[in-house]
């Protein structure tokens, strides 16, 4: 399943922990607070469980958006400059 995960997490430590877990689950960072990837249904369940453990639902928000492959292929990407600056 193709997923887009977008988040706004206020705490630096939690935000870094979330990003590291998204990478471990096989997602790729495409923006500072956005990841995408193809993962199976079990990993989606793992993703939801991990997100619930990390974020504070009173102050943070995470969108997990399933995408059809045709939608993803029709995406428009403008620019790439500066991406490597914050990818560590």
UniProtKB/Swiss-Prot annotation:
Function: CRISPR (clustered regularly interspaced short palindromic repeat), is an adaptive immune system that provides protection against mobile genetic elements (viruses, transposable elements and conjugative plasmids). CRISPR clusters contain sequences complementary to antecedent mobile elements and target invading nucleic acids. CRISPR clusters are transcribed and processed into CRISPR RNA (crRNA). Functions as a ssRNA-specific endoribonuclease. Involved in the integration of spacer DNA into the CRISPR cassette.
Signal sequence, start to end: none
One GO BP: defense response to virus
EC number: 3.1.-.-
Protein name (Swiss-Prot/TrEMBL): CRISPR-associated endoribonuclease Cas2 2
Cofactor(s) essential for the protein: Mg(2+)
One Pfam family this sequence matches: CRISPR_Cas2
Keywords for this protein: Antiviral defense, Endonuclease, Hydrolase, Magnesium, Metal-binding, Nuclease
Class in the EC hierarchy, top level: hydrolase
Residue numbers binding Mg(2+): 8
Keyword Coiled coil: no
